[in-house]
């Protein structure tokens, strides 16, 4: 039995398209309450839905600049930025944002897109914190008291001193070896702290709990095996001293060590946190510290209503355009136009299915790419039908006219699509953001368009001829 490979491939693609688009269709038909619940519960189905970009769904766009001035060598800079991206991704995953887009741009910039996020401020706090956690003993020596007196006398902040210590030689002269000065969260208390004995790299877990003397919210931290040993050693050797917990250069708390804290026991960070602050702090500690400081240099927020408006307008304009094209093809080319309409429909369905399966994000420029793809597909079908009309005009039978039409037009269609595909690949390689979205949808669409225009329509003609359902073509 001879296998019809064209039919097998077409049926397989159709089955694949139904499977790939079913989660998106199911999600689209949900009520707003169910959609929100699915996103909160991180329903696995969401991982298979067609992703919408910021301009369609709403959300936040952030552009971060990494400070790599202290690093020497391009390899070190590249590695630091790559690790920063990975840590930011881990933090965002803990924040519960579905399908964020995080990418490197240039040598030191990081682009972040968070579709559908409802709290941009919390996201910025989560992403922007360096989250360098340190444990330092509070120095209470006479030299430390002199340092604090001089800082108060000169009316400078600890940050000003640390950033330019050479400008204050009198303070530097009495500063205990290896120590530095820090301020508290309230900016009211200053501390002279010895060198860091333990860092956040030794953490195994961090979570929000209620506790403390007044039942306030705090972040409970658990050390890994090596960190537990070091922490036990620190507390054993420094009973009666204050242990400052420092996060990004700010003293969160400085409790007095009353007794040795054994391995396996937890420490806690208390700092008059509200619920959101505590959650963000726990998340960044779990994800780890950024290898380089980052600075927010651009922020854009698209409201959900604007995204919904874009979807509605884009959907309606696309629907009207497609219906008009379908009607024109049917009226002008009759039954052959109807066959072309089937190919156009399959083109759109397969294209959307591939995008959903490959987890591409659909944006407004992407919608423009789809529109251009459909236009190219219409153009290909028009070329085929006009050529068939010419063959019929010279007296050929319907089947011979169709065979000749496809044979003579194939390379014209191929050349047009291939040259456009080359342009799309250049756009993808050198473009950024929206341009890449346009290039991706256009590239996939062109390949699918070639298949539907040349293979699917020919397959339909062959079926109709075989069943004697199409004896004469009127174009």
UniProtKB/Swiss-Prot annotation:
GO terms for cellular component: plasma membrane. The keyword Transmembrane helix applies. The chain crosses the membrane at residues 7-27, 313-333, 338-358, 364-384, 410-430, 437-457. It is found in: Cell inner membrane. Disulfide bonds: none annotated. GO terms for biological process: intracellular protein transmembrane transport; protein targeting; protein transport by the Sec complex. The keyword Transport applies. InterPro entries: Acrflvin-R, SecD, SecD/SecF_arch_bac, SecD/SecF_CS, SecD_1st, SecD_SecF_C, SecD_SecF_C_bact, SecDF_P1_head. GO terms for molecular function: protein-transporting ATPase activity. It is a multi-pass membrane protein. Keywords: Cell inner membrane, Cell membrane, Membrane, Protein transport, Translocation, Transmembrane, Transmembrane helix, Transport. Forms a complex with SecF. Part of the essential Sec protein translocation apparatus which comprises SecA, SecYEG and auxiliary proteins SecDF. Other proteins may also be involved. Part of the Sec protein translocase complex. Interacts with the SecYEG preprotein conducting channel. SecDF uses the proton motive force (PMF) to complete protein translocation after the ATP-dependent function of SecA. Belongs to the SecD/SecF family. SecD subfamily. This is Protein translocase subunit SecD. It comes from Endomicrobium trichonymphae. The lineage of its organism: Bacteria, Pseudomonadati, Elusimicrobiota, Endomicrobiia, Endomicrobiales. The gene is secD.
